[in-house]
Amino acid sequence: MKVTRLAVLNTLATLTVAWLPTTDKTITSSNGTDLFKASHGKIRGVNLGSQFVFEPWIATKAWSELGCEGQESEFDCVMKLGQDAANKAFAKHWDSWITKEDIKEIRSYGLNTIRIPVGYWMNEDLIYHDSEYFPHGGFAYLEKLCGWASDAGLYIIIDLHGAPGAQVAKNAFTGQFADTPGFYVDFQYQRALEFLEWMTIKVHTLHNFRNVGMLEVVNEPVQNPQVTTTLRSNYYPNAFHSIRKVEGALSIDRKDYLHIQMMDGAWGAGDPHEHLTDDYYAAYDNHRYLKWDPRVEVSKDSYIKTSCNDNVATNWPAIIGEWSLGVPDNVQETADWKPYSNLDFYQKWFAAQVQNYEQHQGWIFWTWKTQLDEYRWSYRGTYLSGFWQTSS
C-alpha cells in the first residue's frame, strides 16, 4: 500500500459517518442535522479517556490536583482521601475534563462517534462499601455528557472498562491496581451482568442516552484463552441474555436493540463467538498498539508496512476501538521519532492505520485529549499541533 501525506486528509474528507446509525436507524443532532447522511459508513471517533476511569499517565497534573499524586488508581486515591473528600474532588474533575465545548470540538473535526470508558462502580449499588473504594456520583455526569453528545448527533459506545475484581492485574484502566485479575469467577461475572442490565435500562428509558447504540461488555480481558475460558463460555452468552432480557421486558423493538460488543478474536482472549447461540447485533473490538508488540521491528518502514497489512480482526463486524501513534518509550524522544521533527512519518503512519481499519467498520482513536495534547496520544492535539498540514 502506498501512503502519501495527502492520503490522510483525503480519507478524512470522504469518510465522515458511522455505519450503525445509517444501517439500523437515523440519528440527528438537536437542530435536525444528520451527521451520517450520504456516508461511506465508517465509524470514526475518539475515546474519552480518563473522564470516568482515570489513567494517571494521561494527565499527571490533573491527577495531582485531585489529591491523588503517588497513587496508582482511583481505588487507591479514594482510599487515601476518604469517601467524602474523594467524591468532591472527582466531581470537579468530571465537570471539567470533558465539557460541552469538547463535544462541539469533536464534532467540528468531522468525527461521528465517542467511546466512553466507565467502571462497574458507576452503579453504586454494586460497590462493596466495606472493601471497595471508588468515587460516587459519576452517573449524573455520564447522563449529562451523553445528552450533549446526542444533541450534537454523535453516536455513543459505552464501554465497561473497569470490571469487578479487575480483568487484568496492575493496570489503572480497571480502576484499581489489583495484584491478580479477579474478574474470571462466577460472582464477579454476576456483578458485571447486573451492571449491564442497569445500564441497558438507563439507555432505553432516559432521553439523554438516545444515541447510545452499543455496550461493550468488558474491555481488554487477559490475552490468554486458557484464562478466559469461562469468559467465553459463561460471561459472553449471559451478557447477551441479560441485555436482551431487559430489552424484552421494556418491549424494545428489535431494530432498536443495543449492539453488544466483545473483544475480537484477534485480541488474544479466544474466539468471542465460540459459545454464542444468539449473535443478533453482535459487534467486536480490537485494540492495536504497535508500541507494545514485540513481534514488530521498531523502524519507520516496519511500522508503515505492518499497519498497511495488519490482520486486525477475525470477527465481523469489528471496530478498532483503541489505537494511537505511540512508539516504544526507549525511542519516543530520540531524533528519529520525536513528533515535531518527524511529522511526515507520523502522517503516513496515521493514514496507513486509518486505511486498514476502514476496511472493517472503522476506528476510535485513543484518546481525545491528554494533559500535554501531544498528538501521538491526543486526537485534539493533531489539530492544535498542525499535524494536518500538507507541506513541510
Swiss-Prot record:
Pfam families listed in its UniProt record: Cellulase (PF00150)
Gene Ontology biological process terms in this record = cell wall organization; glucan catabolic process
Where does the UniProt annotation place the signal sequence? 1-18
Q: Which GO terms describe its cellular component?
A: cell surface; extracellular region
Q: Which UniProt keywords apply?
A: Carbohydrate metabolism, Cell wall biogenesis/degradation, Glycoprotein, Glycosidase, Hydrolase, Polysaccharide degradation, Secreted, Signal
Entry function: Beta-glucanases participate in the metabolism of beta-glucan, the main structural component of the cell wall. Acts on lutean, pustulan and 1,6-oligo-beta-D-glucosides.
According to UniProt, the name of this protein is Probable glucan endo-1,6-beta-glucosidase B
Which species is the source of this protein?
Answer: Aspergillus flavus (strain ATCC 200026 / FGSC A1120 / IAM 13836 / NRRL 3357 / JCM 12722 / SRRC 167)
Gene symbol of the encoding locus: exgB
